[in-house]
Amino acid sequence: MAAPARKVLTGARVVLPSGTVDDGELVIDGAHIGGSAPSAGQEPEAERWDLSGHWIVPGFVDLHNHGGGGASFTSGTVDDVLTGIATHRAHGTTTLVASTVTGEMEFLTARAGLLSELTEQGDLAGIHFEGPFISPCRKGAHSEALLRDPHPADVAALLDASRGAARMVTLATELPGGLDSVRLLADRGVIAAVGHTDATYEQTVEAIDAGATVATHLFNAMPPLGHRAPGPIAALLEDERVTVELINDGTHLHPAALELAFHRAGADRVAFITDAMDAAGFGDGRYLLGPLEVDVVDGVARLIEGGSIAGSTLTLDRAFRRAALVDKLPVGQIVRALSANPARLLGLDHRIGSLEPGKDADLVVLDEGFEVKGVLRRGDWVVAPQVAAAA
């Protein structure tokens, strides 16, 4: 017999936009959220799940992710990409934007075609091009030989190849063509992100005024904050038009830097990301990031040549746990950084990012230690809680 279209999740602490409801009840009608309330009587013809001792939070939204489960979004087959998506879904990421790394333009336009198909099918929420329009001075784990200036014609070529699936382009806006490309992206409804940049404070302000709205992994791959030359960090933190990405894995950021970002930008302007590469959810070993060899040791990815950090092996549930248990952030702020803020940035907050009636039934069940115990996506269990369910 088919499972009932209606599910009732009871007894958990449910994190809503208005606050946390203890001993809450969340009703799932098919693929959508039906409603929420303190636990009350029986719903007829519903599958009931007693989640006492758990949290229910919105599904996580990852703006910046290069792969996982041993698979790369830049170079893998369709099956590889689906493996990476499935790996992150099992860790609570119900909405994912696939990020590419620097490559030849011909390669990236072809890649855009493959990833756009998966976007059209609903497996991905879109494409983020990180490179090749970045600064050689702040290239990080990108091949310097393949970098190029952000000429608008090249940026437009990637957008055209994406068939509407491009969601974000990271670029060093101080390079020739940078500001014009920011304006092009803004005109076409694609997020212009400042990253891998050697820009000054003043140049970054110009980029924001031209339409840039995201800081790609703030603090990383950009000049440090200085008292005479504040650089891009100060400009990005102070402007209310900008959302700042943070990689909260304990490697990319000192806790004081994360605290500074939340204090200066505020909880509504922070988006936790993974910047994950193939090893996320898979393990240590040798990998490729684009054309560059990477060695992952104790969960930290570094280029074999030069030793630069090469993305992360983070999953967003780990970012949640660290934020709660190490950084001591309130759960409501963490949920905004993992779900509501990136959903709003993508223009998808009418469907995802919070637990409200009519929105997609995307949610994560966490235990008291914030370990994932269940993942629901569009009303179907990706990971079913190990508790008794009674129809």
Q: Positions of the model-derived regions?
A:
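Conserved, mostly hydrophobic/aromatic
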Residues: F129, L185, A215, A323, ...
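Histidine-rich, glycine-flanked metal-binding segment
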Residues: M1-V57, A391
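Charged helix-capping and loop-helix junction motifs
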Residues: T77-D80, R111-L114, H151-A153, R228-I233
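Active-site core of metal-dependent hydrolases
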Residues: A156, D160-D284
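C-terminal cap of metal-dependent C-N hydrolases
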Residues: A12, R344, S354-A391
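Divalent-metal coordination cores built from histidine and acidic residues
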Residues: I85-A165
